[in-house]
A protein has these predicted regions:
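Surface-exposed, charge/polar-rich loops and edge strands
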Residues: 2-178
Length: 178
């Protein structure tokens, strides 16, 4: 069995509270195997149970809605896909300050024409690169000043689900996914 990583969008901010301990219990009771979490920002690992990422992601979204009463969008990646995200890093010189280097994970890849339009814009001093279902961005003045928020990217790119993790978290997710 392979490992899958569920990246929950916008949890544990404001009234959208999803205690990771409770989520782990719920997932175990629902038949998810080898469930573990990292941080309170919605990072969950589990054995795929012979099911696709889409199937497990859908099951998890249903479980979250039933238990917590609000929609939580989930972006799924396999441990092999996360390996690819790390290996393909298009801005390797920017990882020295990993808190300012972010990977935004999309539920599906944005359309090429929309990506080209965004590439034509000037976001200096920020730098960014698209690869597949991810956008890598470096914000030298800090991520809090960056325009590359999941909300901005979802709106501009027409991609409904996007969630971001800094490079330190991406590396830790891969380590923990085994």
């Amino acid at each position: 069995m392979g490992k899958q990583i569920a990246l929950l969008r916008a949890v544990n901010v404001g009234k959208r509270q999803v205690p990771m301990g409770r989520l782990k219990e719920l997932m175990g009771a629902a038949g998810f195997l080898e469930v573990a979490t990292y941080l309170q920002s919605g990072n969950v690992f589990f054995a795929d149970g012979g099911r696709s990422a889409a199937e497990n992601g859908g099951r998890l979204e249903e479980l979250l809605l039933e238990e917590f009463g609000f929609v939580v969008e989930v972006v799924m990646r396999s441990s092999a896909q996360l390996d690819g995200v790390i290996a393909a890093n298009p801005l390797p010189g920017r990882v020295a300050d990993a808190r300012r280097y972010v990977v935004t994970f999309f539920g599906r890849a944005p359309e090429a024409g929309v990506v080209a339009g965004l590439r034509a814009e000037d976001f200096e001093p920020d730098e960014f690169a698209f690869l597949g279902d991810e956008l890598y961005s470096w914000s030298p003045n800090g991520v809090h000043t960056s325009k590359f928020t999941p909300q901005f990217l979802s709106r501009r790119l027409g991609v409904q689900v996007a969630t971001a993790r800094n490079w330190n978290t991406v590396l830790k997710l891969r380590e923990l996914a085994g």
